[in-house]
A protein has these predicted regions:
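Short S/T/G/P-rich N-terminal loop/turn motif that feeds into the first structured element of a domain
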Residues: 1-49, 53-69, 76-97
């Protein structure tokens, strides 16, 4: 069963532009995860949210340590704070990811 990890982040200096966020994602995430998809979106001037879709809970748990290391680096590099995080199995979806 696919597994989702949702987070909300606070950017003290404001959420960067979409191009800057894409560059950040490419550096921090691309090629270094078993996630099927990672989606980031802006909700206001100082917050963004993210959704990571994993093939299974087991894989999400296996990558937890790696996610934590990347988060610490991102906090230091970008002056951001994790506001909330929720995880759970995907129960239904409209499309195949």
């Amino acid at each position: 069963m696919k597994f989702a990890v949702y987070t909300k982040w606070y950017w003290q200096n404001g959420v960067p532009t979409p191009a800057e966020l894409q560059t950040n994602m490419n550096k921090a995430v691309s090629g270094d995860t078993s996630a099927e998809d990672v989606i980031w979106w802006k909700i206001d001037e100082n917050h963004h949210q993210s959704l990571i879709i994993y093939p299974s809970e087991k894989i999400a748990e296996e990558e937890l340590g790696k996610r934590q290391v990347k988060r610490e680096k991102s906090r230091a590099d970008n002056n951001i704070e994790l506001v909330e995080e929720f995880m759970g199995p995907i129960m239904s979806r409209l499309t195949e990811l």
